[in-house]
Amino acid sequence: MSTTNAINGNLYEQLHQGRTNMYKSKVDVVLGAQWGDEGKGKVVDMLASEVDIVCRCQGGNNAGHTVVANGTEFDFHLLPSGVVNEKCISVIGNGVVIHLPSLFDEVLKNEAKGLQHLEHRLIISDRAHLVFDFHQHVDGMQEAEKGGKSLGTTKKGIGPAYSSKATRNGIRVGELLGDFNAFSDKFKLIVATHLRLFPSINVDVEAELTRYRDYAEKVRPYVKDTICFLHTALRNGKTILVEGANAAMLDIDFGTYPYVTSSNCSIGGVLTGLGLPPQTIGEVIGVVKAYTTRVGDGPFPSEQLNEIGDLLQTRGFEVGVTTKRKRRCGWLDIPLLRYTSLVNGYTCICLTKLDILDTLPEIKVAVSYKKANGDKLDHFPGTIAELGNIEVEYAVLPGWQTSTEHIRNFKELPENAQNYVRFLEKELSVPVRWVGVGKGRESIINVH
């Protein structure tokens, strides 16, 4: 070995020696592994009973999570699903975009269902950006302009709000709570900017400022520096769980662009959306529905536009929590899951809605993609044009044709249902830790 290489080798060893770990705990993460609606909220609800803090890191009220607790069904859009656990602190991080009217409406609706004492256990980042009503109007107009090539946006203003953030004329929660005259000037400027681009939008600036003066006082008790809060919690050994919104295939960078959301809903968004370094991440739980669904437009290789798709839609009650649109349905897609596992680094899987497959005599699983010329693809296509022209190859597995809804022990599942789970494990080389066979948290089976 040359002297230079020897020195470099020593330097490399030195770099990795003597590391000090300033944290006493880790951050576990729950991420959607497909196109959303996998059942992340239920998984978070299950795990939140054992953690100190639950966080949202990205997205806005375009996300929809349903949690059933003590027989009551809660719908969350901005609030982390962990708020149903009264011993848990819920954090809305800096990467989230917040429409305050929707947040307050969501709080009121869920308080009416029995959610209590949120003022003592909800923290909102002062660095989170605000979504204004005009962002929502612009969202609808931009979607209408696309005509037959619409992206299927929720029209909640999420994209325009992130656009304002990226062009550096967005407004953050902390600015609303500071000098209100400075906030007013900035609000007038952002409205003027949007009016130049979209002259037909109607904004009553003075009425909005009056409204936001009230919102400032309503939201003030919840707001603090969440970055310091979370790092202090980790140094003190507090357990933290992050609830990813949307899902990997809707990620702005890694999803089926442009049929995606406007934020990073993969593991990277957890770090930037909460101000966490990579070494704080512990378990990364990929939530996988036992079949595949998608809301809105965009390519969907394993989609079933037939009686199978109809059966999955009907049995699975596949209607969007936020949009109320019927979800498109298809078979489980292994190449897609391998891809999102590469990006996110799943340490384990929670497989949900296995019971929806109970009536099928046989079940197909997409196992590989082929190009139009017959060549197998060894990677997930990077463009929608390429993804739209692939041919899907399926494995056919025997069904079990008996109800799994009331089973609570993995070994009591029908053999073919167990084989379906093991097939997924083998194909992904990631262990399946939980299997869901119903709506409530009690319907989640511990596999190992």
From Swiss-Prot:
Its main location: cytoplasm. Pathway: Purine metabolism; AMP biosynthesis via de novo pathway; AMP from IMP: step 1/2. Substrate binds at V321, T322, T323, K324, R325, K326, R327. Keywords: Cytoplasm, GTP-binding, Ligase, Magnesium, Metal-binding, Nucleotide-binding, Purine biosynthesis. One of its GO terms (biological process) is 'de novo' AMP biosynthetic process. It catalyses: IMP + L-aspartate + GTP = N(6)-(1,2-dicarboxyethyl)-AMP + GDP + phosphate + 2 H(+). GTP binds at residues 36-42, 64-66, 327, 353-355, 436-438. Binds 1 Mg(2+) ion per subunit. Mg(2+) binds at D37, G64. It is found in: Cytoplasm. Its EC number is 6.3.4.4. IMP binds at D37, E38, G39, K40, N62, A63, G64, H65, T154, R168, N246, T261, R325. Belongs to the adenylosuccinate synthetase family. Plays an important role in the de novo pathway and in the salvage pathway of purine nucleotide biosynthesis. Catalyzes the first committed step in the biosynthesis of AMP from IMP. This is Adenylosuccinate synthetase. It comes from Drosophila pseudoobscura pseudoobscura (Fruit fly).
